[in-house]
Amino acid sequence: MSSLSLAHYLVLGAVLFAISIVGIFLNRKNVIVLLMAIELMLLAVNLNFVAFSHYLGDLAGQVFVFFILTVAAAESAIGLAILVVLFRNLDTINVDDLDSLKG
């Protein structure tokens, strides 16, 4: 049984990144889908960090991924909280309807 090489992980990361790019360009209406695509993009980059870190034998990349995931979790929580407030005030999460500022 053959083990997975660095190229396998990099191809998987590239596929995940491409799926997130396609998700952003195809669905530009829903803010929740946009946030999920951006998070998938960040996870693809983190997968590449871990793959290179394991391949080079350096744990600094894996530790860096933990910090990135912590910041990404906080970013997601804040983004979803903003979306809840927008939905309560405007009754929509459509990107086209969020173009006006009210002071």
From Swiss-Prot:
Disulfide bonds: none annotated. One of its GO terms (molecular function) is quinone binding. It is found in: Cell inner membrane. Its main location: membrane. GO terms for biological process: ATP synthesis coupled electron transport. Keywords: Cell inner membrane, Cell membrane, Membrane, NAD, Quinone, Translocase, Transmembrane, Transmembrane helix, Transport, Ubiquinone. Its EC number is 7.1.1.-. It is a multi-pass membrane protein. InterPro entries: NADH_UbQ_OxRdtase_chain4L/K, NUOK/Mnh_C1-like. It catalyses: a quinone + NADH + 5 H(+)(in) = a quinol + NAD(+) + 4 H(+)(out). It holds the Pfam family Oxidored_q2. Gene3D superfamilies: 1.10.287.3510. One of its GO terms (cellular component) is plasma membrane. The chain crosses the membrane at residues 6-26, 32-52, 63-83. NCBIfam families: PRK05715.1-2, PRK05715.1-3, PRK05715.1-5. NDH-1 shuttles electrons from NADH, via FMN and iron-sulfur (Fe-S) centers, to quinones in the respiratory chain. The immediate electron acceptor for the enzyme in this species is believed to be ubiquinone. Couples the redox reaction to proton translocation (for every two electrons transferred, four hydrogen ions are translocated across the cytoplasmic membrane), and thus conserves the redox energy in a proton gradient. NDH-1 is composed of 14 different subunits. Subunits NuoA, H, J, K, L, M, N constitute the membrane sector of the complex. HAMAP family: NDH1_NuoK (MF_01456). PANTHER family: NADH DEHYDROGENASE SUBUNIT 4L-RELATED, NADH-UBIQUINONE OXIDOREDUCTASE SUBUNIT ND4L. Belongs to the complex I subunit 4L family. This is NADH-quinone oxidoreductase subunit K. The lineage of its organism: Bacteria, Pseudomonadati, Pseudomonadota, Betaproteobacteria, Burkholderiales.
